[in-house]
Amino acid sequence: MILGLDPGRDKCGLAVMKQTKQIVARLIVDSNQTISTIQRLCQEYNIDLIVMGNGTTSKDWYYKIKSNLTSEISVVTINESNSTLEARDRYWLMHPPQGFQRIVPQGFRIPPCPVDDIVAILLIERYLRSFN
């Protein structure tokens, strides 16, 4: 299983995905709860790889994760350029707009909730695509 992490200062997006690209969990947590949540997810889903974005806080998060998890879990960083914009588009695929929102062009729609968990999914997908 692979855990995706979109690290941030205030909140972090997390997703757990099978190698078959089936999403088994996705959530957004406060940054101060991220390490304990990752530890729980690693035990619950037998995570062997963490894929995280390479944004501004990634170095700090990398060291936090490595110092709080067993060495058997690999941690890799991946380019997260444009991942938030891509996650907004993915949000509308996962939750098609209703009512008035249907006539608003997709580029003008803003999801009604954070998309950090979807970014975490996209980071895993980017990682898996890098092998094809």
Where are these regions (language model features)?
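Phosphate- and other anionic-substrate recognition elements at nucleic-acid/protein interfaces
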Residues: M1-L5, R9-N132
